[in-house]
Amino acid sequence: MNFLFRLFSARTLLTIIFLSTGFARPASTRQTPQPTAIELSKKETVASAFLRSMAFQEYQVRSAAEAMPEELYTYRPAEGKFKDQKPEFGPAEMRTFAEQVKHVACANFGFASELNGDKPPEGCDKGGPDPAKTKRELLIYLRNSFAVIRKSFTAINAKNQFDPIEGPYAGPNTRMGLAVVVVWHNADHYGQMVIYLRLNGIVPPASRPSPPPVKDTY
């Protein structure tokens, strides 16, 4: 997944910085008093900082996946097929919505494996080895991937944050560097999923006046 770095545009970087500062939050949390910077500085850890950012990304991605009707999981923007596309710039045809969901889930599992020192699943760029296909199966796969990455994040601390991480997905890297990639990778694909929803007249849950909670079971 080294090609991801070539896709990491300035716009994506600004988005991640904006999100990580806490200025952008789901509408459902805007009325909840947020801790001050001083309060955070007294209790914040490396793990909690990443977990806070990841919680927002998890809500965005999972709620978007839930909002898309199953019959539109095969939807692919018609303008997403490019002629004379260079292979090194990625596939010539945009993913279907289902492929977006599956890619994010597989990538989360892959990143978690690398953070844990395990072998990651192969072929996440093309969906990976998991057989999930229906909307329900993909939602479960996606939900489980976030649970796994959260667990991996909890193991990051001040002593190991700069430990070397090898692997095909965003490697070589450090533990902290890879955690940053995990957050922006989810934000990147959420931005694409939003377009799919909007093109079908669906307002992303995170953008609604009263965002609904994500489901625990499917």
What does each of the following model-derived ranges do?
Residues 1-13:
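Bacterial N-terminal signal peptides that target proteins for export
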Residues 10-22:
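Bacterial N-terminal signal peptides
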Residues 19-35:
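Bacterial Sec-dependent signal peptides at the C-terminal "C-region" and cleavage site
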Residues 47, 51, 55-62, 74-126, ...:
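Short, contiguous alpha-helical
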Residues 66-75, 152-162, 198-205:
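Surface-exposed helix-capping loop/turn segments at secondary-structure junctions
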Residues 130-166, 174-188:
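Acidic/histidine-rich alpha-helical segments that form the ligand environment
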